[in-house]
Structures are given as C-alpha cells and as structure tokens.
C-alpha cells in the first residue's frame, strides 16, 4: 500500500526535525507557530530555503496524496500520468526525512518527531483516536477513516537537492484511495549553490489535483 499524507492544511512540507530545531534555536525563535512566522517574515523564510531547512509544497487542494521516495518506494506505474517535474530545492537532513501536512508546523511540536515507541491516545472533545510512532502519525475521523499527517523516511545525514514529480491517476478511484501523488528524489551535494523558492507561484504550481 502506498504511504500517504492528507493535506488538510492545503500544503505538504518536507524537513528533517533536527535541522529545523537547530535553525529555530540559532535564530532564537521560541514561537511554536512556525508556519505563521514564515508566512509573515519573508526574509526568515528565504533563509530557510537558502540553508535547506525545509521545503513547502504550498497551495494544494485538501486531498489524500500518495507519497513515494526514490530508492525506497516503487515509482508510479502506467496507471498514473506525470503532471509536474521540478528540481533543485535545497534540503539538509540530519535525522531522517519527515513529510507532513503543512499544518504540522502550526504549531511545530518538537517532541512529536522524537517518539521512541508506538503509542495510541485520544484527544478531546470527540475522543478521536490518534497514533504516533518513530515513523508516522495519524488519526481516525468520526467516520473511522485514517488520516495520515506525518511520515518519516530513514535517509543518511547530508545536504541534498530535492526533485519533485507530481502524478495524477488516469482513472480515479473512490476516496480515501489517493488519486494524486508526489514522487520525491534526493541528490547528495557537498554544498548548496544558490536556492530555489517553491512559493514562487509564477515558477511552481504543485496543485496537481487541478491538472486532472
């Protein structure tokens, strides 16, 4: 079964938890609402892109997306059609790669990314069942659907250039089966030379659900 992320926050984000935590500590940022901060402070956001702190895929529809990483997952097969192909986003990994719903930065709960064991728990007011482990987080809706909010891949520490391909299923299936997905690949580099900004709407469009 494909790994997946539900983009309830209308975006997906890729980062290494320790890279982000060390950046926040160095910049003396104590606010947990990292997403709001980066939306308001453009110079700080651009610094995250220059240093490879995180890569957001903004302004995408609230959908369930299949997630694949080159070298660890099988590529999308001929039942899918590629819609986008972007390359060259800086990303520094120190303790594995997290791929999350972008709302997981609002707030960014650092301890959630260092769980040592699997754990089920519930949250008020509806008593929704949640699950967290060293490799993934999800919760169950009132309709018993599982919504994945964060998944982790074990990736060696280092600096990488991230490539992003977006795919759409040629023949749609019923929800919650994903009909769109992203295939990510990482190319190791010694240093970052310049950077690309995925929030530049004129250059990048990640909303593959509109390309069916």
Residue ranges and their predicted role:
Residues 1-127, 132, 171-212:
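Primarily secretory-pathway and cell-envelope proteins
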Residues 140-154:
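Beta-sandwich interaction modules
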Residues 134-136:
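Arginine-glycine-biased low-complexity disordered regions
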């Amino acid at each position: 079964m494909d790994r997946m992320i539900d983009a309830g926050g209308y975006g997906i984000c890729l980062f290494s938890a320790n890279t982000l935590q060390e950046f926040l500590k160095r910049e003396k940022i104590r606010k947990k609402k990292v997403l709001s901060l980066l939306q308001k402070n453009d110079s700080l956001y651009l610094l995250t892109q220059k240093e490879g702190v995180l890569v957001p895929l903004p302004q995408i529809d609230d959908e369930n997306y299949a997630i694949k990483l080159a070298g660890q997952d099988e590529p999308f097969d001929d039942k899918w059609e590629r819609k986008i192909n972007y390359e060259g986003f800086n990303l520094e990994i120190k303790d594995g790669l997290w791929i999350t719903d972008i709302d997981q930065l609002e707030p960014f709960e650092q301890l959630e990314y260092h769980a040592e064991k699997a754990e089920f728990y519930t949250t008020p007011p509806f008593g929704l069942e949640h699950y967290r482990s060293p490799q993934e987080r999800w919760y169950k809706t009132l309709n018993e659907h599982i919504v994945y909010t964060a998944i982790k891949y074990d990736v060696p520490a280092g600096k990488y250039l991230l490539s992003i391909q977006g795919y759409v299923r040629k023949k749609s299936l019923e929800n919650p089966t994903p009909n769109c997905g992203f295939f990510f690949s990482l190319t190791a580099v010694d240093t970052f030379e310049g950077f690309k900004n995925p929030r530049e709407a004129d250059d990048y469009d990640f909303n593959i659900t509109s390309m069916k």
